[in-house]
Amino acid sequence: MHVLLADDQAGVRSALRFLLEQEPGIIVVGEAAEAETLLAQEMAIQPDLVLLDWELPGSQAADLLLALRLRYRRTMVIALSGRPEACQEALDAGVDAFVSKGEPPEHLLAAMYAFKRGGD
């Protein structure tokens, strides 16, 4: 599974990369700190999954999700946020899953593996 990380905080991206690099079959193929970079990388890389900070600078999250979907429909998007109220907003906008940044890493991995099982 090829994963693109999108979060404005370098520390969060580093922690996600470290976590995911421990998992067999998961390859981090790119990182973005803002919306414009995310869209450019998503178009070039065409990842299986985007881990999207729901508060990523440079665009409204729902608009950014729509742009991702219009460019490459096959990509799954899991929204991440430290705001619990963002969960329903993200799900209503059409993300495939939502994981709070405060949840244990196992929750993120479970959402990712559920996608992988469904995609096989």
Question: Model-predicted segments: where are they?
Answer:
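The C-terminal output helix
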Residues: 113-120
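Two-component/phosphorelay signaling modules centered on CheY-like receiver
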Residues: 10-30
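Hydrophobic/aromatic residues positioned on beta-strands within the core alpha/beta folds
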Residues: 78-80
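Active-site residues of response regulator receiver
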Residues: 7, 53-54
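Alpha4 helix (beta4-alpha4-beta5 surface) of REC/receiver domains from two-component response regulators
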Residues: 63, 82-99, 103, 107-110
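Short amphipathic alpha-helix used as the core "switch/output" element in two-component signaling
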Residues: 62-73
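Acidic, metal-coordinating helix/loop segments flanking the phosphotransfer/catalytic sites
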Residues: 31-49
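Acidic catalytic/metal-coordinating carboxylates
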Residues: 34, 60-63
